[in-house]
Amino acid sequence: MADKLYQMEVQAEPQYVAEQSSVANDVYVFAYRVRITNTGSEPAQLISRHWIITDANQQVQEVRGMGVVGEQPHLDPGQVFEYSSAAHITTPYGSMKGAYQMMADDGRRFEASIPEMTLVAPRVLH
């Protein structure tokens, strides 16, 4: 089956960053760590990213760009790439999901889905 050639497993884990957040100013910062594993049989390079970030008010930010953290990693079968970044929203909870555009060494483009992450700040007492 051709699909097994072009497979990436994406795991993402968010964490609230209290030191960089400002509840009084409606700024909630979430760091996240992403692990991308080439589970297919074809080497491939991450070309670009597309994130959809939604806050509790259903305000959506779409973030698109080349690569991740300044890199366009090339992953051989079984190889893993990890990186960390952050997102800001204006409510204490929301979600993030998206996809990476990949290009296999044979020239085929495919998408690696980023599973939805729930962003939740701990309860803040006023």
Swiss-Prot record:
Q: Which domain of life is it from?
A: Bacteria
Which Pfam families does the UniProt entry name for this protein?
A: DUF525
Q: Which GO terms describe its biological process?
A: error-free translesion synthesis
Q: Which Gene3D superfamilies match?
A: ApaG domain
The record's PROSITE patterns line, in alphabetical order, gives: APAG
Q: Which residues form the ApaG domain?
A: 2-126
Q: Which NCBIfam families match?
A: PRK05461.1 (NF003967)
PANTHER family recorded for this chain?
Answer: F-BOX ONLY PROTEIN 3, POLYMERASE DELTA-INTERACTING PROTEIN 2
* The protein's name: Protein ApaG
| Native source species | Chromobacterium violaceum (strain ATCC 12472 / DSM 30191 / JCM 1249 / CCUG 213 / NBRC 12614 / NCIMB 9131 / NCTC 9757 / MK)
